[in-house]
């Protein structure tokens, strides 16, 4: 997956630097997923890179018969779980950091749990959130939407809920 992405970026470097939705010229499955997720969330395709790569890795595991597996790519998680699991959230300096976990029931298929932060990690952030976590069966979509919400989040702003209508994302 990473080699596919790197080869595409070598041919189309703008794909890697735009903060806006972008339609690639060609590219494979990972590139297509990133671009589609970015269009849905209104962000550039690289906002979905960690989720898309984790998803590709989990697909390989599931394709080999894994019924339980987790890939955590810097807070962007792809998982398949035949048992209940708990997923904690590290939110940097927030007083809520490492103090709670999401409890996920056993489930069929691959699921995405992606967290984006303005205070943890090297990503460019246009917002103020310590952690925004988004769940979706489309791992790239969860990653892109977590980034989009983090970028827009301002103290006291409650407009974001309207953006999720009809997207397949739960936040």
Where are these predicted regions, by residue range?
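Mature catalytic core of soluble alpha/beta enzymes
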Residues: 1-171
């Amino acid at each position: 997956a990473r080699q596919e992405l790197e080869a595409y970026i070598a041919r189309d470097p703008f794909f890697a630097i735009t903060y806006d939705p972008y339609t690639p010229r060609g590219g494979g499955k990972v590139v297509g997923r990133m671009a589609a997720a970015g269009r849905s969330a209104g962000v550039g395709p690289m906002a979905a890179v960690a989720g898309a790569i984790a998803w590709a890795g989990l697909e390989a595991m599931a394709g080999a018969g894994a019924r339980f597996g987790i890939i955590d790519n810097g807070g962007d998680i792809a998982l398949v779980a035949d048992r209940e699991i708990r997923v904690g959230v590290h939110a940097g300096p927030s007083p809520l950091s490492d103090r709670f976990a999401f409890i996920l029931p056993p489930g069929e298929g691959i699921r995405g749990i992606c967290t984006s932060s303005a205070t943890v990690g090297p990503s460019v952030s246009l917002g103020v959130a310590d952690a925004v976590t988004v769940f979706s069966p489309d791992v790239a979509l969860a990653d892109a939407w977590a980034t989009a919400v983090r970028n827009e989040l301002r103290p006291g702003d409650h407009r974001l809920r309207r953006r999720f209508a009809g997207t397949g994302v739960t936040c």
